[in-house]
From Swiss-Prot:
One of its GO terms (biological process) is cellular response to heat. Keywords: ATP-binding, Chaperone, Coiled coil, Cytoplasm, Nucleotide-binding, Repeat, Stress response. Residues 158-339 are annotated as: NBD1. The keyword Acyltransferase does not apply. The lineage of its organism: Bacteria, Pseudomonadati, Chlamydiota, Chlamydiia, Chlamydiales. Homohexamer. The oligomerization is ATP-dependent. Its main location: cytoplasm. It is found in: Cytoplasm. Residues 340-545 are annotated as: Linker. One of its GO terms (cellular component) is cytoplasm. ATP 2 binds at G605, P606, T607, G608, V609, G610, K611, T612. This is Chaperone protein ClpB.
C-alpha cells in the first residue's frame, strides 16, 4: 500500500469527491491537480508560487479541461482511478524513492506532473520557463535536507512563510503605521539584539502602550538601514500563534510545526528575528500528558543565541507565567514600556493623523487630538494611552465618514415635508369641497417651491461629495508618492527622488490646499468633514455615559448657579447645598486632588429632610439621570462577612467570579454618585474597606484588581445625633451656624465612627429640621411634578393658594420631615385625579384647577383661553 502525506491523502479524497459530484466515470490527474491547487497551504502550491508561476491561470485551465470530460446522465457514479492517474502516482513514488522519502508528498507529485507532459499542465509549464532540473534544485533548497518521514512532515516545510508574517516586507510595502516617540525603547531593543548571547529583548508593558508598535518601528528601521551594521539586512517575522495551533489535531503536530519555524530561523545564520506577541501563551502550549510545552522547545536556542527573539507581554502575565519559569525568564532581557505622558501621546497622534485622514477621507483638527488624549485620560481610566486616544480618533472619523455617505438632515427633512404635502393634496382632491380648486392650487405652489429647494440642496450635496471624494483620492495619491520617494531614496534613484520631492509632491499638496479652501468657502455646508473636539467629546459620552460634551458647551455658567438648581429640589438645607456645589465646581475645573475621589460627604440629620433627595438631585444634574446614583442600604451590611457583597468573594468561595456590587458598579461607571444610606448600621469591618477608597481613590476587589474610584462622588447619610440636633435647632431658631450644630452632634458621632474614618471625610454636613415655610415650598415642588405628568396627557393642572396652605398644614410633622407630606399628596391629590381620569370626568385637551370647598379638596374645569 502506498504511503501518502496528509496533504496528498486529503487531495486524493477531494479528487474522488469532485469526480463523483461531476458525474465523471474516472478520477483523472486533472481532478487531483485541481484538488492540490485548492489547498493554498500545501507544499505543491508553495513551490508553484516560488517559481513565480500563476496558480490562478492553471486553476482556470484545469476547470475548463474537466468541463469537457464525458459525464454519466443517470444513476449513481463510482469513479475509478484513470490509467493516467495511476501512472502519475507511480512516477511520484519513484521521485520519493530517489529523494529517500518514506511518504509521497506534494513536491513529488509536482515533479511527476512536470515530467508527464499532460495537458493543460504542460502548456502552463511552458509559461514558467523553469526546467525539471531547476525545479528539483528549488525543492531541495526548500527542504533544507529534511525528509518525508511522517504523514505530517509536509506541513513542516517553509515554517517561517506558513506560520509567520514578514514585518520587514510589510514595512517595505508601506503597510505599517509610522512609529512615533518610542526611540528610546527601540534603541534599547537594538542594543539587546546586538549582544552575543541571550540577545532576546522582552517588551513588558500594559495593554495599549505600544509594545507591538516598537517591533513595527524596528522593522521600519531595518528597511531604512537605520540600525547597527550587525543588524543590517536582517528580516523581522511575527509568529502567528493562531496559524501554528490551528489544525494541529494529533499529539506532537504542534511541536513539529514550531520546530520547523525554529529550524528555519536557525538555518538563516542569524538573518531572521522572530517577534512573539503575547509570549506568555507559549508557556504550557502543546503540553498534554507529560509532553514538552512550546517554551521548553525555545530555551536551548535562546540560550545559545542562535534564535533572535523579541517577546511582548503584559506585566501581569509576565509575573504569572514567565517569572515562574526561571530558566525561561533568564533567557530574556526585560525592557519596560511605560505609558506615554499626555504630551507624548499628542505627539504620537500627530504622527498618525495623516494615515487616519487618508483612510476615512476627513480632516482631523489639532483640537481633536488634544481632546482625544485629555478626555480619554480623564474619563477612560481602565485603558492606556496612546491606544485609547487612537481609538477615539478612529471612531470619531468613522462617524463623520458614515455621515458623509448618508442623506444630510436638511434634505431628509425637506423630503418628509414634501411627502406630507403630496398626501395632503391627494386628500383635498378627494373631498371636492367648494374651495377645492383654490386649496389645490395653493398646495401645488408649495410643492413646486419645495421641489425646487430640494433640487438645489441635492445639487449642493453632490458637489460637496465630489469635492470630498476628490480630496480623499488626492491624499491617497500624495501618500503613494511619499512612499515612492522613500523607496527611490533607498535604492539610490536620485533622479526619481528629485522629481517627486521638488515637482510632483509640492504640486499635489498645492492642489489639496486649494480644494480644502474652496470646500471651506462654501455657504450652507451640508456635510461635516472635520473631526473636532466636540465630536471627540460625543464619542466619549457614547462610550462612558458621561455627558462630557456638556462641559465643552459652556457648562461653566451652569456650575456657577449650581446652588439655585439644587434648591429647586432640596429645600431648607443651605449648608449642604453650598458645600456640595463648591466641591463639584473644584472637581469640574480640575483643581481638586487628583488622587482622591471627587468628594466624600456625610449628611447628618433626621429622617425626611432631603438627604437622599440631594444625592438624587446631584446625580441628575451631573449625569442627566437619577439612575447614575448607586445606592447601598447599609442595614444589609451589618455582619463582617457582608464585605464580600461589596468587593466580591475571596478565591475559593462561592460567587468569586461574580465580583462585588460596589467594585463592579464603579468599574462599569467610574463617574457615579455613590450613596451609602444609614452608614451607622454597617459593621465596622465594612467601614474599614472604605478607608482606602476615601483616602487614595482605589478599591481592591476580591480578585486583587484595582478599581479607580477617583471620579466618583461618595455620600453617606446617617441619623446619628438627630434628637440632639432637633433639640438644638428648636432652641436656637434661625440663629444657626454649621459649626455650632456640629459641636452638638460630634460627641455622639464619635461613639459610632472611628477617628481614622471621620478623618477621611471631606465635610460633615448637618441637615436641619424643616420649617413650615420649607414645607410650603416642597408642596409647590410636588404639585409641579404632578402637573408635569398630566401635561404628557394634554391636561393642564393649576391650583390656588388654599390648596397649598391645606396640604402644608396637614402634611407638616417636625419629627418626620417631608415624608408624611408626600403620602398626603398621594392620598388627597393623586388618588382624586386618577379616579376622575378613569371615570372620564377629566379628558385630554382640558384645563382643571384644584381648590378647597368646605375643607375638602376638589377640582373644577377651567375654560382654556382661545
Amino acid at each position: 500500500m502506498e504511503k501518502f502525506s496528509d496533504a496528498v491523502s486529503e487531495a486524493l479524497e477531494k479528487a474522488f469527491e469532485l469526480a463523483k459530484s461531476s458525474k465523471h466515470t474516472y478520477v483523472t490527474e486533472n481532478h487531483l491537480l485541481l484538488a492540490l491547487l485548492e489547498n493554498t497551504e500545501s507544499l505543491f502550491y508553495l513551490v508553484i508560487k516560488d517559481i513565480h508561476g500563476n496558480p490562478g491561470l492553471l486553476n482556470t485551465a484545469v476547470k475548463d479541461a474537466l468541463s469537457r470530460e464525458p459525464t454519466v446522465v443517470e444513476g449513481e457514479v463510482d469513479p475509478k482511478p484513470s490509467p493516467g492517474l495511476q501512472t502519475l502516482l507511480r512516477d511520484a513514488k519513484q521521485e520519493a524513492k530517489t529523494l529517500g522519502d518514506e511518504y509521497i508528498s506534494g513536491d513529488h507529485l509536482l515533479l511527476a506532473f512536470w515530467s508527464s507532459n499532460k495537458e493543460p499542465f504542460n502548456s502552463w509549464k511552458q509559461t514558467t520557463k523553469v526546467s525539471f532540473k531547476d525545479l528539483k534544485n528549488l525543492i531541495t533548497k526548500i527542504r533544507r535536507g529534511n525528509r518525508m518521514d511522517s504523514p505530517s512532515a509536509e506541513s513542516n516545510f517553509q515554517g517561517l512563510e506558513k506560520y509567520c508574517k514578514n514585518l520587514t516586507a510589510l514595512a517595505r510595502e508601506g503597510k505599517l503605521d509610522p512609529v512615533i516617540g518610542r526611540d528610546e525603547e527601540i534603541r534599547r531593543t537594538i542594543q539587546v539584539l546586538s549582544r552575543r548571547t541571550k540577545n532576546n529583548p522582552m517588551l513588558i508593558g500594559e495593554p495599549g502602550v505600544g509594545k507591538t508598535a516598537i517591533a513595527e518601528g524596528l522593522a521600519l528601521r531595518l528597511i531604512q538601514g537605520d540600525v547597527p551594521e550587525s543588524l543590517k539586512g536582517k528580516q523581522l517575522y511575527v509568529l502567528d500563534m493562531g496559524a501554528l495551533i490551528a489544525g494541529a489535531k494529533y499529539r506532537g503536530e504542534f511541536e513539529e510545526r514550531l520546530k520547523s519555524v525554529l529550524k528555519d530561523v536557525e538555518s538563516g545564520d542569524g538573518e531572521h528575528i522572530i517577534f512573539i506577541d503575547e509570549v506568555h501563551t507559549l508557556v504550557g502550549a502543546g503540553a498534554t500528558d507529560g509532553a514538552m510545552d512550546a517554551a521548553n522547545l525555545l530555551k536551548p536556542a535562546l540560550a545559545r543565541g542562535t534564535l533572535h527573539c523579541i517577546g511582548a507581554t503584559t506585566l501581569n502575565e509576565y509575573q504569572k507565567y514567565i517569572e515562574k519559569d526561571a530558566a525561561l525568564e533568564r533567557r530574556f532581557q526585560p525592557i519596560f514600556v511605560t505609558e506615554p505622558s499626555l504630551e507624548d501621546a499628542v505627539f504620537i497622534l500627530r504622527g498618525l493623523r495623516e494615515k487616519y485622514e487618508i483612510f476615512h477621507g476627513v480632516r482631523i483638527t489639532e483640537g481633536a487630538l488634544n481632546a482625544a488624549v485629555l478626555l480619554s485620560y480623564r474619563y477612560i481610566p481602565d485603558r492606556f494611552l496612546p491606544d485609547k486616544a487612537i481609538d477615539l480618533i478612529d471612531e470619531a472619523a468613522s462617524l463623520i465618514r458614515m455621515q458623509i455617505g448618508s442623506l444630510p438632515l436638511p434634505i431628509d427633512e425637506k423630503e418628509r415635508e414634501l411627502a406630507a404635502l403630496i398626501v395632503k393634496q391627494e386628500a383635498i382632491k378627494r373631498e371636492q369641497s367648494p374651495s377645492y380648486q383654490e386649496e389645490a392650487d395653493a398646495m401645488q405652489k408649495s410643492i413646486d417651491a419645495l421641489r425646487e429647494e430640494l433640487a438645489s440642496l441635492r445639487l449642493g450635496w453632490d458637489e460637496e461629495k465630489k469635492l470630498i471624494s476628490g480630496l480623499k483620492e488626492k491624499k491617497n495619491s500624495l501618500e503613494s508618492m511619499k512612499f515612492s520617494e522613500e523607496e527611490a531614496e533607498r535604492v539610490a534613484d536620485y533622479n526619481r527622488v528629485a522629481e517627486l520631492r521638488y515637482s510632483l509632491i509640492p504640486q499635489l499638496e498645492e492642489e489639496i490646499k486649494q480644494d480644502e479652501a474652496s470646500l471651506n468657502q462654501r455657504d450652507n455646508r451640508l456635510l461635516q468633514e472635520e473631526v473636532d473636539e466636540r465630536l471627540i467629546a460625543q464619542v466619549v459620552a457614547n462610550w462612558t455615559g458621561i455627558p462630557v460634551q456638556k462641559m465643552l458647551e459652556g457648562e461653566a455658567e451652569k456650575l456657577l448657579i449650581l446652588e439655585e438648581s439644587l434648591e429647586e429640589r432640596v429645600v431648607g438645607q443651605p449648608f449642604a447645598v453650598s458645600a456640595v456645589s463648591d466641591s463639584i465646581r473644584a472637581a469640574r475645573v480640575g483643581l481638586n486632588d487628583p488622587q482622591r475621589p471627587l468628594g466624600v460627604f456625610l449628611f447628618l440629620g433626621p429622617t425626611g429632610v432631603g438627604k437622599t433627595e440631594l444625592a438624587k438631585a446631584l446625580a441628575d444634574l451631573l449625569f442627566n439621570k437619577e439612575e447614575a446614583m448607586v445606592r447601598f442600604d447599609m442595614s444589609e451590611y451589618m455582619e463582617k462577612h457582608s464585605i464580600s457583597k461589596l468587593i466580591g468573594s475571596s478565591p475559593g468561595y462561592v460567587g468569586y467570579e461574580e465580583g462585588g456590587s460596589l467594585s463592579e458598579a464603579l468599574r462599569r461607571r467610574p463617574y457615579s454618585v455613590v450613596l451609602f444610606d444609614e452608614i451607622e448600621k454597617a459593621d465596622k469591618e465594612v467601614l474599614n474597606i472604605l478607608l482606602q477608597v476615601f483616602d487614595d481613590g482605589i478599591l481592591t476587589d476580591g480578585k486583587k484588581r484595582k478599581v479607580n474610584c477617583k471620579n466618583a462622588l461618595f455620600i453617606m447619610t446617617s441619623n446619628i445625633g438627630s434628637p440632639e440636633l432637633a433639640d438644638y435647632c428648636s432652641k436656637k431658631g434661625s440663629e444657626l451656624t454649621k459649626e455650632a450644630i456640629l459641636s452638638v452632634v460630634s460627641p455622639v458621632l464619635k461613639r459610632y465612627l472611628s477617628p481614622e474614618f471621620m478623618n477621611r471625610i471631606d465635610e460633615i454636613l448637618p441637615f436641619v429640621p424643616l420649617t413650615k415655610e420649607d414645607i410650603v415650598k416642597i408642596v409647590g415642588i410636588q404639585m409641579r411634578r404632578i402637573a408635569q405628568r398630566l401635561k404628557a396627557r394634554r391636561i393642564n393642572l393649576s391650583w390656588d393658594d388654599s390648596v397649598i396652605l391645606f396640604l402644608s398644614e396637614q402634611g407638616y410633622d417636625s419629627a418626620f420631615g417631608a415624608r408624611p407630606l408626600k403620602r398626603l399628596i398621594q392620598q388627597k391629590v393623586v388618588i382624586l385625579l386618577s379616579k376622575a381620569l378613569l371615570k372620564g370626568d377629566i379628558k385630554p385637551d382640558t384645563s382643571i384647577e384644584l381648590t378647597m370647598a368646605k375643607e375638602v379638596l376638589v377640582f373644577k374645569k377651567v375654560e382654556t383661553p382661545s
